[in-house]
């Protein structure tokens, strides 16, 4: 009898799951957790904790789709506790004594706020008032000479280089460093960088922040020119995954998709079409985008074996569904 009553109470309190959309919303809500007095997004069950990159990428979908902005605000306020002098730590945890920082994480914060503005009634002026100091601190941190492994170069692009560990979402590593090294100018980092500066300028313009506009106003043009010069592979008609002063990595990977999907783009329409064409041809599957083209000699078609072998496959062929949203956005921009 007690079990029957308990089951009845559970069924009454359980969220509706009468449609695919309701099932998605219900499942997404399970990643919102309360821990250490904070509202966080769990990166994955069962062994992942909370990270800033995963939080910023997932938060709009989890907290703004069929939900209220209250959860969004709570998660952002919790994440802001882990922003140190303009850099978000990789991990959201009160137990981390020496936080580590990645090249792209802080830039995803700008993208998250862009989705926030689109889905709520918050104005640009309000967002700048509440988050402007953090946004300025992030941009200035990349300009600072203190951070040699992640810095703005003279050409306006972000140079990230650390032989001891990975600095992007390609985060598999061994005792010898990143399993898939990507040192130098990284394509999605710089696509996010351009988007971040353009969005900050738009907010600052609405808020009449003349000092910020004066300091950063000419940067988009410089970055766009450098981006096309550094990343565009003229012989192949797509973007390098990363590049340095003497070499372009020509492997076909999904990271270049962000250069076609964000709100502010450095590529003209013709180049966007070329990038989408190669992604569609070599990376698109019914489940998401491959992390590497099957045409590459490094392609791994299966994720089996020991930890090192599986980690290598994760970023050399395994499919990642999270790119699907950006693939759709890029196509909508071009084809409506």
What are these language model-derived features?
Residues 1-336:
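Acidic, mature catalytic/reactive cores of soluble proteins
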């Amino acid at each position: 009898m007690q079990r029957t009553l308990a089951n009845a109470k559970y069924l009454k309190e359980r969220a509706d799951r009468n449609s695919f959309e309701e099932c998605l919303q219900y499942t997404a809500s399970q990643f919102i957790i309360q821990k250490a007095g904070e509202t966080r997004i769990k990166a994955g069950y069962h062994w992942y904790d909370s990270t800033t990159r995963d939080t910023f990428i997932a938060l709009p979908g989890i907290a703004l789709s069929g939900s209220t902005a209250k959860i969004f605000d709570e998660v952002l306020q919790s994440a802001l506790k882990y922003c140190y002098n303009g850099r978000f730590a990789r991990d959201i945890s009160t137990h981390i004594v020496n936080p580590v920082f990645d090249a792209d994480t802080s830039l995803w914060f700008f993208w998250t706020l862009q989705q926030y503005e689109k889905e709520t009634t918050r104005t640009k002026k309000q967002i700048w008032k509440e988050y402007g100091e953090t946004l300025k601190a992030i941009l200035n941190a990349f300009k600072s000479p203190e951070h040699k492994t992640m810095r703005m170069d003279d050409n306006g692009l972000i140079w990230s280089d650390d032989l001891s560990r990975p600095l992007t979402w390609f985060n598999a590593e061994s005792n010898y460093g990143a399993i898939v090294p990507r040192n130098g100018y990284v394509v999605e980092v710089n696509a996010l960088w351009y988007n971040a500066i353009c969005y900050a300028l738009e907010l600052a313009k609405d808020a009449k922040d003349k000092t910020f506009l004066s300091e950063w106003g000419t940067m988009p043009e410089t970055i766009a020119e450098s981006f096309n010069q550094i990343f565009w592979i003229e012989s192949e008609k797509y973007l390098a995954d990363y590049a340095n002063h003497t070499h372009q990595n020509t492997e076909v990977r999904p990271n270049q998709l962000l250069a076609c999907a964000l709100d502010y783009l450095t590529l003209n329409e013709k180049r966007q079409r070329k990038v989408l064409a190669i992604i569609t041809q070599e990376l698109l599957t019914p489940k998401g985008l491959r992390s590497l083209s099957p045409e590459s000699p490094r392609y791994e078609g299966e994720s089996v074996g020991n930890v090192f072998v599986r980690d290598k496959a994760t970023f050399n062929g395994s499919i990642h569904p999270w790119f699907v949203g950006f693939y759709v956005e890029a196509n909508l921009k071009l084809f409506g």
